């Protein structure tokens, strides 16, 4: 553990919420386990962290997945799609608001820094703004403030999960389901149990909390990975 690495924020938070952060050396050791490392080197294998904190695990996995996406890419455009595909496989739920804010910021920073640097190093090009815009939507959809055990978000509404299903190499189909529907076996495919999460609406003050009725699914039009930000609904 590094000398400046804090494992707790306060004794009260440990007492009230059991909050203890994982040191980086432990994160690295866990991700280096063969069964985990193999999934990290996959653009479609998904990870859910039900108590995500500030994103120690998710950020490290994202960093490694983006580098793997770069290895597979043969062009700047392909790298943009693969980078978004890698990002779409990572999901987090966190109870505490300040942690969720840091989680979202850390995921955004990790994606943007890696994408910008790899674009410059590999292709001598500037980042595509559409990739940034689409990454923001994915992170907003995949990082939820809520209670994973109760399956509710910060507003008491059902946690919503998005399945990002690749269509070939360049397109994606997004489908949203309540966590309850997934737990009950009503998911759209046999892979949704890998977990696909969503919307900490309070993190984006220009958006209003959404109240969910009886409908358990919402369908988005298939689109290019780089057009996810348009969020066109079927």
Spans of model-derived segments:
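SAM-dependent methyltransferase catalytic region
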Residues: 2-234
């Amino acid at each position: 553990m590094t000398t400046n690495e804090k494992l707790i924020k306060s004794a009260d938070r440990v007492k009230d919420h059991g909050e203890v952060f994982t040191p980086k050396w432990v994160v690295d050791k866990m991700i280096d386990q063969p069964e985990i490392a193999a999934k990290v080197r996959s653009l479609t294998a998904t990870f859910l962290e039900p108590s995500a904190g500030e994103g120690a695990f998710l950020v490290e996995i994202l960093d490694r997945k983006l580098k793997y996406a770069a290895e597979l890419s043969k062009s700047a455009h392909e790298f943009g799609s693969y980078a978004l595909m890698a990002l779409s496989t990572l999901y987090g739920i966190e109870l505490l608001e300040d942690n969720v804010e840091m989680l979202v910021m850390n995921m955004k920073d990790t994606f943007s820094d890696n994408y910008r640097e790899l674009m410059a190093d590999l292709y001598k090009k500037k980042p595509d703004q559409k990739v940034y815009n689409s990454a923001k939507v994915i992170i907003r959809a995949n990082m939820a403030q809520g209670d994973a055990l109760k399956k509710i978000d910060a507003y008491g509404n059902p946690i919503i999960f998005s399945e990002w299903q690749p269509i070939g190499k360049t397109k994606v189909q997004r489908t949203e389901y309540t966590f309850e529907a997934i737990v009950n076996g009503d998911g759209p495919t046999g892979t949704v149990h890998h977990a696909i999460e969503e919307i900490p609406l309070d993190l984006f003050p220009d958006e209003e909390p959404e109240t969910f009725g009886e409908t358990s699914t919402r369908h988005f039009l298939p689109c290019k990975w780089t057009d996810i930000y348009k969020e066109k609904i079927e």
